[in-house]
């Protein structure tokens, strides 16, 4: 494993334990060159369905892209990185359960909105404003009205 501090490839594992939820292994490593320690996470590489975009393109599911989009919606909100990671873990676990080779991006977007609604309503509205591409203020206000009714 390449050391993030000095770039050398030799490191040794000094501690290894299951991550929360057991979906990954957290490893504490020590660089044999500079002696600094760093953490890595190892997870099973699953074959996930392709994401079918609104314009018809297909692309591989990108966990980091999804995390980045959710983080943007949660900016300056009391939503931790860990909460976002768990949200994406739940969504990622649902993908193989569909049993499909492709999943529409709209399905993933709706799942994110459902999760965000329960976590932080402001983040939900921010995500919805980008995801739903509101045409005007009236559409945006309609979404807010629906949120207030719930």
Curated annotation (Swiss-Prot):
One GO MF term attached to the UniProt entry: double-stranded DNA binding
Record note on cofactor: Binds 1 zinc ion.
Keywords tagged on the record: ATP-binding, DNA-binding, Metal-binding, Nucleotide-binding, Repressor, Transcription, Transcription regulation, Zinc, Zinc-finger
Zinc fingers, unnamed class: 3-34
Cofactor(s) this protein cannot do without: Zn(2+)
GO biological process annotation, one example: negative regulation of DNA-templated transcription
PROSITE patterns recorded: ATP_CONE
Residue stretches making up the ATP-cone domain: 49-139
Pfam families: ATP-cone, Zn_ribbon_NrdR
Family: Belongs to the NrdR family.
Function as written in the Swiss-Prot or TrEMBL entry: Negatively regulates transcription of bacterial ribonucleotide reductase nrd genes and operons by binding to NrdR-boxes.
HAMAP family: NrdR
Protein name as catalogued: Transcriptional repressor NrdR
Gene source species: Geobacter sulfurreducens (strain ATCC 51573 / DSM 12127 / PCA)
